[in-house]
UniProtKB/Swiss-Prot annotation:
This is Increased recombination centers protein 22-1. It is a single-pass type I membrane protein. Is probably involved in a pathway contributing to genomic integrity. The gene is IRC22-1. Residues 20-161 are lumenal. It is found in: Endoplasmic reticulum membrane. Residues 1-19 form the signal peptide. Residues 183-234 are cytoplasmic. Belongs to the IRC22 family.
C-alpha cells in the first residue's frame, strides 16, 4: 500500500468533510471500531456523558481489522447531533491520524481530543474514522454517545468575576458621588438646623427699661396723679 497515495487522498477527503454526511454507495467492510471516554471509562453507550463547556475530553478508539488485507487508520472526525431531530449541530475538527497500519486479525488504539464549545443542551456524539483499504479512503461511522453539556460554574475568586465586581463597585461609587454633588449637597444645606446664639446669663437690664422701687413693684406704668396722691397720704 502506497502511503503517499493514501495521504493525498486523505487530504482531499478532509478538505471536503466540513459538512460531512455519509453519501454515495456504501461499502461493506469487516472492520470493528469502538471507543470509550478516557475521563469516564465506566460509561457505556446507554449512559449519558456529562460534559462541561470549555473542558477537553479524550476519546480512546480501538480498531480491529477482520479483513484479509491490512488497513491503515488515517484520520478521524465527528458530529454533534440533536438527539430528537437528528439534525447536525456542529462538526468536530477533522484530524489526521498516523497513518497507523493494522494487519489482518490485529487491533490498534489511538486517541482523539474533543474540545467542548456548545450551548448548554443535550446532544448525541457520532465519531467517524477514516480508513485506507484497497487504495480507497473509507469513512466508518462509530456508535453514538449521548452527552449533556452544561456551562462551567464560576468561582467567587475567579479573576473574571473579581474584575466584574471591581467595575461594578467603581461604577456605583462614581454614580453615588455625582448624585451627591448635584442633589445631595443642596438638599442637606436646606434641611440643616439654624443655630441661634444663646443669651448670656447674668446680663444687666437696660437703663431705659422699667425699674422696681423699694416698694417692690414697677411704678412706670402708674399714672402720675395717682402717685402724687399716694405720696400725700404717706
Amino acid at each position: 500500500m502506497k502511503f503517499s497515495t493514501i495521504l493525498t487522498a486523505l487530504t482531499a477527503v478532509i478538505a471536503t468533510v466540513a459538512g460531512y454526511e455519509t453519501s454515495g454507495k456504501p461499502h461493506t467492510v469487516d472492520i470493528l471500531i469502538d471507543y470509550s471516554i478516557k475521563e469516564t471509562p465506566e460509561l457505556s453507550q446507554n449512559d449519558v456523558a456529562n460534559w462541561v463547556n470549555g473542558d477537553k475530553y479524550t476519546l480512546e478508539y480501538v480498531v480491529s481489522n477482520n479483513e484479509e488485507t491490512e488497513i491503515a487508520v488515517v484520520g478521524v472526525t465527528g458530529q454533534f447531533k440533536n438527539p430528537v431531530t437528528n439534525q447536525i449541530v456542529t462538526n468536530l475538527t477533522t484530524g489526521q491520524v498516523g497513518p497507523i497500519t493494522v494487519a489482518p486479525g490485529e487491533s490498534i488504539k489511538f486517541e482523539q481530543i474533543v474540545d467542548v464549545d456548545l450551548m448548554a443542551n443535550n446532544y448525541e456524539l457520532f465519531p467517524y474514522v477514516f480508513v485506507a483499504h484497497d487504495d480507497l479512503i473509507k469513512v466508518i461511522p462509530c456508535r453514538g454517545q449521548l452527552t449533556s453539556v452544561v456551562d462551567a460554574t464560576i468561582s467567587f475568586f475567579d479573576p473574571r468575576l473579581i474584575l466584574l465586581e471591581l467595575v461594578l463597585l467603581v461604577t456605583f461609587g462614581a454614580a453615588a458621588y455625582f448624585i451627591y454633588e448635584i442633589w445631595g449637597k443642596q438638599y442637606l444645606k436646606g434641611t440643616a438646623p439654624v443655630k441661634v446664639p444663646a443669651r448670656k446669663s447674668g446680663s444687666t437690664v437696660s437703663k431705659k427699661g422699667a425699674s422696681a422701687t423699694a416698694s417692690g413693684f414697677d411704678e412706670s406704668w402708674i399714672p402720675e396723679a395717682h402717685l402724687k396722691k399716694n405720696k400725700k397720704k404717706a
